[in-house]
């Protein structure tokens, strides 16, 4: 029952949030969509809006405020059109941190931009092991607690029912 609920939630987040969000910043592709969904599954279980414990990470994609700040300072400041597209997803009455925590379209776009700024090509759609390795290297980082095995297992559990 829990897996069925996670599958339903994953399908809704994919259709109502991730797809439209990535399209609005002109960075949609099947592989990007899958990677952003997989990231939400493994980072928050599609459940947590604030990092479990004492950590600073926010939203389904568990982005740290310092990562968001760096994205603007060292990446979007040099790509004003992309920065404007992201800001159009932002809820203006919320702080940047509140947007990360509660604005799903904004959070999905920030996650995608975290991957976009890396020079490596995204793994192909359907390549969960490749996506897991890409997530570990570029998002969770080598020092992060996540593992490729955990990504593959958790994402497979949700997506095998889809």
Please name every model-derived segment.
Residues 44-51, 140-149:
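Secretory-pathway/luminal and periplasmic proteins that interact with or process carbohydrate-rich
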Residues 130-144, 155:
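Short, charged interaction patches at domain edges and termini
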Residues 148-162:
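Long, charge-rich low-complexity segments
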Residues 23-31:
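Short, charged helix-capping/linker segments at alpha-helix termini
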Residues 30-38, 126-135:
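Alpha-helical scaffolds flanking conserved acidic
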Residues 4-22, 41-119:
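Peptidoglycan-targeting cell-wall enzymes and recognition modules
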Residues 118-126:
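Inter-helical turn/loop segments and adjacent helix faces that build the functional surface
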């Amino acid at each position: 029952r829990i897996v069925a609920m996670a599958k339903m939630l994953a399908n809704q987040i994919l259709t109502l949030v991730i797809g439209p969000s990535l399209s609005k910043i002109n960075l949609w592709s099947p592989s990007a969509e899958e990677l952003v969904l997989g990231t939400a599954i493994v980072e928050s279980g599609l459940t947590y809006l604030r990092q479990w414990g004492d950590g600073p990470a926010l939203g389904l994609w568990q982005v740290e405020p310092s990562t968001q700040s760096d994205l603007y300072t060292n990446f979007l400041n040099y790509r004003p059109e992309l920065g404007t597209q992201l800001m159009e997803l932002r809820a203006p009455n919320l702080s940047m941190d509140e947007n990360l925590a509660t604005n799903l379209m904004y959070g999905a776009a920030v996650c995608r931009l975290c991957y976009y700024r890396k020079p490596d090509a995204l793994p192909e759609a359907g390549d969960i092991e490749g996506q897991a390795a890409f997530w570990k290297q570029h998002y969770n980082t080598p020092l992060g607690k996540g593992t490729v095995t955990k990504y593959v297992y958790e994402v497979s559990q949700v997506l095998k029912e889809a």
